[in-house]
Protein backbone atom coordinates (compact mmCIF):
# COMPACT_ATOMS: atom_id res chain seq x y z
CA UNK A 1 0.00 0.00 0.00
CA UNK A 2 2.81 2.38 0.92
CA UNK A 3 4.66 1.61 -2.31
CA UNK A 4 1.53 2.22 -4.36
CA UNK A 5 0.95 5.61 -2.73
CA UNK A 6 4.62 6.57 -3.17
CA UNK A 7 4.53 5.50 -6.81
CA UNK A 8 1.36 7.52 -7.37
CA UNK A 9 2.93 10.62 -5.79
CA UNK A 10 6.19 10.34 -7.74
CA UNK A 11 4.30 9.86 -11.01
CA UNK A 12 2.25 13.00 -10.50
CA UNK A 13 5.24 15.04 -9.31
CA UNK A 14 7.41 14.13 -12.29
CA UNK A 15 4.60 14.65 -14.81
CA UNK A 16 3.49 17.96 -13.25
CA UNK A 17 7.02 19.36 -13.12
CA UNK A 18 7.83 18.43 -16.71
CA UNK A 19 4.49 19.93 -17.83
CA UNK A 20 5.40 23.22 -16.16
CA UNK A 21 8.88 23.03 -17.68
CA UNK A 22 7.48 22.58 -21.18
CA UNK A 23 5.05 25.47 -20.71
CA UNK A 24 7.83 27.79 -19.55
CA UNK A 25 10.07 26.71 -22.39
CA UNK A 26 7.45 27.41 -25.06
CA UNK A 27 6.78 30.79 -23.48
CA UNK A 28 10.46 31.65 -23.80
CA UNK A 29 10.29 30.74 -27.48
CA UNK A 30 7.20 32.88 -28.08
CA UNK A 31 8.34 35.84 -25.96
CA UNK A 32 12.05 36.36 -26.47
CA UNK A 33 12.72 38.73 -23.57
CA UNK A 34 15.77 39.05 -21.38
CA UNK A 35 13.58 39.28 -18.28
CA UNK A 36 12.49 35.64 -18.58
CA UNK A 37 15.97 34.14 -18.87
CA UNK A 38 15.74 33.22 -15.20
CA UNK A 39 12.54 31.29 -15.89
CA UNK A 40 14.27 29.42 -18.71
CA UNK A 41 17.09 28.40 -16.38
CA UNK A 42 14.52 27.30 -13.81
CA UNK A 43 12.83 25.13 -16.42
CA UNK A 44 16.10 23.31 -17.03
CA UNK A 45 16.43 22.64 -13.33
CA UNK A 46 12.87 21.36 -13.37
CA UNK A 47 13.91 18.56 -15.74
CA UNK A 48 16.51 17.53 -13.16
CA UNK A 49 13.72 17.33 -10.57
CA UNK A 50 11.75 15.24 -13.06
CA UNK A 51 14.75 12.94 -13.50
CA UNK A 52 14.95 12.24 -9.79
CA UNK A 53 11.17 11.78 -9.67
CA UNK A 54 11.25 9.18 -12.47
CA UNK A 55 14.28 7.53 -10.86
CA UNK A 56 12.38 7.25 -7.58
CA UNK A 57 9.39 5.85 -9.46
CA UNK A 58 11.50 3.15 -11.11
CA UNK A 59 13.24 2.26 -7.84
CA UNK A 60 9.89 2.04 -6.06
CA UNK A 61 8.52 -0.37 -8.65
CA UNK A 62 11.77 -2.34 -8.52
CA UNK A 63 11.58 -2.79 -4.76
CA UNK A 64 7.85 -3.49 -4.77
CA UNK A 65 7.86 -6.02 -7.62
CA UNK A 66 11.22 -7.62 -6.85
CA UNK A 67 12.46 -7.35 -10.43
CA UNK A 68 13.83 -4.66 -12.72
CA UNK A 69 10.87 -2.55 -13.91
CA UNK A 70 10.99 -3.32 -17.62
CA UNK A 71 8.43 -6.10 -17.91
CA UNK A 72 5.67 -4.25 -19.80
CA UNK A 73 5.02 -1.33 -22.11
CA UNK A 74 4.23 1.14 -19.32
CA UNK A 75 7.52 0.51 -17.52
CA UNK A 76 9.49 0.67 -20.75
CA UNK A 77 7.92 4.04 -21.62
CA UNK A 78 8.78 5.41 -18.17
CA UNK A 79 12.33 4.15 -18.64
CA UNK A 80 12.41 5.79 -22.09
CA UNK A 81 11.38 9.14 -20.62
CA UNK A 82 14.07 8.61 -17.98
CA UNK A 83 16.63 8.15 -20.79
CA UNK A 84 15.50 11.40 -22.43
CA UNK A 85 15.84 13.23 -19.11
CA UNK A 86 19.44 11.99 -18.87
CA UNK A 87 20.21 13.45 -22.30
CA UNK A 88 18.55 16.68 -21.17
CA UNK A 89 20.79 16.86 -18.11
CA UNK A 90 23.87 16.32 -20.26
CA UNK A 91 22.84 19.32 -22.35
CA UNK A 92 22.16 21.29 -19.16
CA UNK A 93 25.72 20.88 -17.92
CA UNK A 94 27.05 21.58 -21.42
CA UNK A 95 25.91 25.20 -21.65
CA UNK A 96 27.05 25.69 -25.25
CA UNK A 97 24.63 23.09 -26.62
CA UNK A 98 21.89 23.54 -24.06
CA UNK A 99 19.25 25.25 -26.20
CA UNK A 100 19.62 22.86 -29.14
CA UNK A 101 19.04 19.62 -27.22
CA UNK A 102 16.47 20.99 -24.78
CA UNK A 103 14.17 21.75 -27.69
CA UNK A 104 14.03 18.01 -28.35
CA UNK A 105 14.33 16.42 -24.91
CA UNK A 106 11.84 18.51 -22.91
CA UNK A 107 8.80 17.83 -25.16
CA UNK A 108 9.85 14.18 -25.57
CA UNK A 109 9.84 13.56 -21.83
CA UNK A 110 6.36 14.98 -21.31
CA UNK A 111 4.80 13.31 -24.36
CA UNK A 112 6.23 9.88 -23.57
CA UNK A 113 5.38 10.05 -19.89
CA UNK A 114 1.97 11.51 -20.67
CA UNK A 115 1.20 8.61 -22.99
CA UNK A 116 2.47 6.11 -20.42
CA UNK A 117 0.15 7.48 -17.74
CA UNK A 118 -2.83 7.96 -20.06
CA UNK A 119 -5.95 5.84 -20.24
CA UNK A 120 -4.50 3.74 -23.08
CA UNK A 121 -2.32 1.99 -20.53
CA UNK A 122 -4.72 1.89 -17.60
CA UNK A 123 -3.99 -1.77 -16.97
CA UNK A 124 -0.23 -1.54 -17.36
CA UNK A 125 0.83 0.47 -14.28
CA UNK A 126 0.17 -2.42 -11.88
CA UNK A 127 3.29 -4.48 -11.21
CA UNK A 128 2.86 -8.19 -11.89
CA UNK A 129 4.82 -11.40 -11.54
CA UNK A 130 7.17 -11.99 -14.45
CA UNK A 131 6.25 -14.61 -17.00
CA UNK A 132 8.72 -17.53 -17.07
CA UNK A 133 10.40 -16.26 -20.25
CA UNK A 134 11.36 -13.01 -18.48
CA UNK A 135 12.69 -14.59 -15.29
CA UNK A 136 16.32 -14.25 -16.30
CA UNK A 137 19.34 -12.15 -15.40
CA UNK A 138 19.42 -11.04 -19.04
CA UNK A 139 16.26 -8.97 -18.57
CA UNK A 140 18.06 -5.92 -17.20
CA UNK A 141 20.91 -6.15 -19.71
CA UNK A 142 18.86 -6.70 -22.85
CA UNK A 143 15.84 -4.47 -22.29
CA UNK A 144 17.73 -1.57 -20.69
CA UNK A 145 20.23 -1.47 -23.56
CA UNK A 146 17.43 -1.55 -26.11
CA UNK A 147 15.47 1.25 -24.44
CA UNK A 148 18.59 3.39 -23.97
CA UNK A 149 19.38 2.77 -27.63
CA UNK A 150 15.87 3.77 -28.67
CA UNK A 151 16.07 6.93 -26.58
CA UNK A 152 19.41 8.05 -28.01
CA UNK A 153 18.45 7.15 -31.58
CA UNK A 154 15.13 8.97 -31.30
CA UNK A 155 16.81 12.07 -29.89
CA UNK A 156 19.51 12.07 -32.57
CA UNK A 157 16.94 11.46 -35.30
CA UNK A 158 14.83 14.36 -34.06
CA UNK A 159 17.89 16.60 -34.34
CA UNK A 160 18.32 15.39 -37.92
CA UNK A 161 14.66 16.14 -38.62
CA UNK A 162 15.19 19.64 -37.25
CA UNK A 163 18.17 19.93 -39.60
CA UNK A 164 15.95 19.02 -42.55
CA UNK A 165 13.30 21.54 -41.53
CA UNK A 166 15.85 24.35 -41.25
CA UNK A 167 17.60 23.36 -44.48
CA UNK A 168 14.48 23.22 -46.64
CA UNK A 169 12.79 26.19 -45.02
CA UNK A 170 12.32 28.87 -47.65
CA UNK A 171 13.96 32.14 -46.79
CA UNK A 172 11.69 35.13 -47.44
CA UNK A 173 12.60 37.32 -50.40
CA UNK A 174 15.06 40.02 -49.50
CA UNK A 175 13.85 43.50 -50.26
CA UNK A 176 17.27 44.92 -51.07
CA UNK A 177 16.97 43.51 -54.61
CA UNK A 178 13.84 45.56 -55.10
CA UNK A 179 15.74 48.66 -54.00
CA UNK A 180 18.25 48.09 -56.80
CA UNK A 181 15.45 48.10 -59.38
CA UNK A 182 13.97 51.24 -57.85
CA UNK A 183 17.35 52.95 -58.01
CA UNK A 184 17.54 52.34 -61.73
CA UNK A 185 14.13 53.96 -62.27
CA UNK A 186 14.93 56.89 -60.01
CA UNK A 187 18.14 57.58 -61.88
CA UNK A 188 16.08 58.12 -64.98
CA UNK A 189 13.60 60.56 -63.38
CA UNK A 190 15.46 62.90 -61.00
CA UNK A 191 18.19 65.47 -61.26
CA UNK A 192 21.83 64.87 -60.38
CA UNK A 193 21.57 66.31 -56.85
CA UNK A 194 18.58 64.21 -55.99
CA UNK A 195 20.18 61.16 -57.53
CA UNK A 196 23.29 61.60 -55.40
CA UNK A 197 21.22 61.67 -52.20
CA UNK A 198 19.11 58.69 -53.22
CA UNK A 199 22.11 56.62 -54.23
CA UNK A 200 23.87 57.32 -50.94
CA UNK A 201 20.77 56.44 -48.95
CA UNK A 202 20.09 53.25 -50.88
CA UNK A 203 23.73 52.17 -50.71
CA UNK A 204 23.51 52.33 -46.92
CA UNK A 205 20.24 50.42 -46.90
CA UNK A 206 21.68 47.90 -49.31
CA UNK A 207 24.71 47.32 -47.10
CA UNK A 208 22.52 46.92 -44.02
CA UNK A 209 20.29 44.40 -45.78
CA UNK A 210 23.28 42.45 -47.06
CA UNK A 211 24.76 42.33 -43.57
CA UNK A 212 21.42 41.19 -42.14
CA UNK A 213 21.03 38.52 -44.80
CA UNK A 214 24.61 37.36 -44.32
CA UNK A 215 24.32 37.18 -40.54
CA UNK A 216 21.05 35.28 -40.78
CA UNK A 217 22.45 32.79 -43.28
CA UNK A 218 25.61 32.43 -41.21
CA UNK A 219 23.54 31.67 -38.11
CA UNK A 220 21.50 29.10 -40.06
CA UNK A 221 24.72 27.52 -41.27
CA UNK A 222 26.15 27.35 -37.75
CA UNK A 223 22.89 25.90 -36.41
CA UNK A 224 22.79 23.25 -39.14
CA UNK A 225 26.39 22.30 -38.41
CA UNK A 226 25.71 21.98 -34.68
CA UNK A 227 22.58 19.91 -35.25
CA UNK A 228 24.50 17.62 -37.59
CA UNK A 229 27.38 17.39 -35.09
CA UNK A 230 25.21 16.38 -32.13
CA UNK A 231 22.90 14.20 -34.17
CA UNK A 232 25.84 12.10 -35.34
CA UNK A 233 27.26 11.67 -31.85
CA UNK A 234 23.97 10.86 -30.16
CA UNK A 235 23.01 8.39 -32.90
CA UNK A 236 26.45 6.79 -32.63
CA UNK A 237 25.90 6.30 -28.90
CA UNK A 238 22.42 4.92 -29.50
CA UNK A 239 23.75 2.57 -32.17
CA UNK A 240 26.19 1.10 -29.64
CA UNK A 241 23.39 0.57 -27.12
CA UNK A 242 21.19 -0.99 -29.80
CA UNK A 243 23.98 -3.34 -30.89
CA UNK A 244 24.65 -4.48 -27.32
CA UNK A 245 20.92 -4.92 -26.77
CA UNK A 246 20.48 -7.08 -29.88
CA UNK A 247 23.51 -9.23 -29.05
CA UNK A 248 22.44 -9.74 -25.44
CA UNK A 249 18.94 -10.57 -26.64
CA UNK A 250 20.37 -13.20 -28.99
CA UNK A 251 22.27 -14.85 -26.13
CA UNK A 252 19.14 -14.72 -23.96
CA UNK A 253 17.05 -16.24 -26.76
CA UNK A 254 19.52 -19.08 -27.13
CA UNK A 255 19.28 -19.87 -23.42
CA UNK A 256 15.47 -19.64 -23.41
CA UNK A 257 14.36 -21.01 -26.79
CA UNK A 258 17.52 -22.76 -27.99
CA UNK A 259 18.17 -20.45 -30.93
CA UNK A 260 20.05 -17.17 -31.27
CA UNK A 261 17.68 -15.78 -33.89
CA UNK A 262 14.07 -16.75 -34.61
CA UNK A 263 13.02 -13.98 -37.01
CA UNK A 264 10.40 -12.85 -34.54
CA UNK A 265 8.57 -9.69 -35.73
CA UNK A 266 10.33 -7.48 -33.19
CA UNK A 267 13.68 -9.13 -33.91
CA UNK A 268 13.18 -8.53 -37.63
CA UNK A 269 12.26 -4.87 -37.20
CA UNK A 270 15.12 -4.36 -34.75
CA UNK A 271 17.50 -5.76 -37.35
CA UNK A 272 16.03 -3.46 -40.03
CA UNK A 273 16.40 -0.49 -37.68
CA UNK A 274 19.99 -1.47 -36.91
CA UNK A 275 20.73 -1.72 -40.64
CA UNK A 276 19.28 1.72 -41.37
CA UNK A 277 21.38 3.40 -38.70
CA UNK A 278 24.43 1.44 -39.86
CA UNK A 279 23.82 3.01 -43.28
CA UNK A 280 23.54 6.40 -41.56
CA UNK A 281 26.92 5.96 -39.89
CA UNK A 282 28.43 4.76 -43.16
CA UNK A 283 27.14 7.87 -44.92
CA UNK A 284 28.68 10.07 -42.23
CA UNK A 285 32.11 8.62 -43.04
CA UNK A 286 31.76 9.80 -46.65
CA UNK A 287 32.34 13.54 -46.84
CA UNK A 288 30.69 13.83 -50.23
CA UNK A 289 27.23 12.71 -49.08
CA UNK A 290 26.95 14.19 -45.60
CA UNK A 291 24.31 16.57 -44.28
CA UNK A 292 20.91 16.22 -45.92
CA UNK A 293 21.42 12.64 -47.13
CA UNK A 294 22.31 11.33 -43.68
CA UNK A 295 19.46 13.33 -42.14
CA UNK A 296 16.97 11.68 -44.51
CA UNK A 297 18.27 8.26 -43.47
CA UNK A 298 17.88 9.29 -39.81
CA UNK A 299 14.28 10.30 -40.56
CA UNK A 300 13.61 6.83 -41.95
CA UNK A 301 15.24 5.33 -38.87
CA UNK A 302 13.02 7.46 -36.64
CA UNK A 303 9.91 5.96 -38.23
CA UNK A 304 11.32 2.43 -38.01
CA UNK A 305 12.06 2.78 -34.30
CA UNK A 306 8.41 3.49 -33.54
CA UNK A 307 7.33 0.61 -35.77
CA UNK A 308 9.74 -1.67 -33.93
CA UNK A 309 8.75 -0.32 -30.53
CA UNK A 310 4.96 -0.28 -30.94
CA UNK A 311 4.35 -2.55 -33.93
CA UNK A 312 4.51 -5.85 -32.07
CA UNK A 313 2.73 -4.33 -29.08
CA UNK A 314 -0.19 -3.32 -31.27
CA UNK A 315 -0.34 -6.69 -33.04
CA UNK A 316 0.24 -8.81 -29.95
CA UNK A 317 2.04 -11.56 -31.89
CA UNK A 318 5.43 -13.19 -31.70
CA UNK A 319 7.79 -14.01 -28.86
CA UNK A 320 7.77 -10.40 -27.63
CA UNK A 321 3.98 -10.15 -27.28
CA UNK A 322 4.05 -10.30 -23.48
CA UNK A 323 4.27 -6.50 -23.30
CA UNK A 324 1.58 -5.75 -25.88
CA UNK A 325 -1.61 -3.75 -25.55
CA UNK A 326 -3.67 -6.90 -25.99
CA UNK A 327 -1.76 -9.07 -23.54
CA UNK A 328 -3.71 -7.68 -20.64
From Swiss-Prot:
Localization per Swiss-Prot or TrEMBL: Plastid, Chloroplast thylakoid membrane
Keywords linked to the UniProt accession: Chloroplast, Cytochrome c-type biogenesis, Membrane, Plastid, Thylakoid, Transmembrane, Transmembrane helix
An annotated GO BP: cytochrome complex assembly
GO cellular component, one term: chloroplast thylakoid membrane
Major subcellular location class: plastid
Molecular function, one GO term: heme binding
Residues that span the membrane, as ranges: 13-33, 46-66, 73-93, 101-121, 146-166, 234-254, 263-283, 295-315
Taxonomic superkingdom: Eukaryota
Membrane topology: Multi-pass membrane protein
Family listed: Belongs to the CcmF/CycK/Ccl1/NrfE/CcsA family.
SUBUNIT field: May interact with Ccs1.
Function per UniProt: Required during biogenesis of c-type cytochromes (cytochrome c6 and cytochrome f) at the step of heme attachment.
The protein, known as: Cytochrome c biogenesis protein CcsA
Native species: Arabidopsis thaliana
Gene expressing this chain: ccsA
Amino acid sequence: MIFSILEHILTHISFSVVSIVLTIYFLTLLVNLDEIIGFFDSSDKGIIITFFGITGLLLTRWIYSGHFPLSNLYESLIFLSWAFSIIHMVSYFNKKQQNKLNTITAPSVIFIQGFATSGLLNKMPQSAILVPALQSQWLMMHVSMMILGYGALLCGSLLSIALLVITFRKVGPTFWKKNIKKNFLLNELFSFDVLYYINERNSILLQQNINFSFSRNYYRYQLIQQLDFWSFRIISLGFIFLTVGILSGAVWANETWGSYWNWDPKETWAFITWTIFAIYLHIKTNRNVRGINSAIVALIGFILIWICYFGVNLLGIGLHSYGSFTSN
